[in-house]
Amino acid sequence: APSEPHHPGDQATPDQLAQYYSDLYQYITFITRPRF
């Protein structure tokens, strides 16, 4: 399973934040999808 992404912090660039939210979305989708 993917590990939970870490927030890049208050000094993060927009690109870093975009990558973080992309990774977070994929992580949440993975852990919440049915396991059938």
UniProtKB/Swiss-Prot annotation:
The cross-references to InterPro entries, in alphabetical order and at most eight, read: Pancreatic_hormone-like, Pancreatic_hormone-like_CS
SMART domains tied to this protein: PAH (SM00309)
Q: Name one GO molecular function term.
A: neuropeptide hormone activity
Listed Pfam families: Hormone_3
Q: Which residues carry this modification: Phenylalanine amide?
A: 36
Q: Does the keyword Chaperone apply?
A: no
* Annotated GO biological process: feeding behavior; neuropeptide signaling pathway
Give the GO cellular component terms, alphabetically. extracellular space
Compartments where found: Secreted
Q: What is its main location?
A: secreted
Q: Which UniProt keywords apply?
A: Amidation, Hormone, Secreted
Summarizing the function annotation, the protein's role is: Hormone secreted by pancreatic cells that acts as a regulator of pancreatic and gastrointestinal functions.
What family is it from? Belongs to the NPY family.
What is the protein's name according to its record?
Pancreatic polypeptide
- In the UniProt record, the gene name given for this protein reads ppy
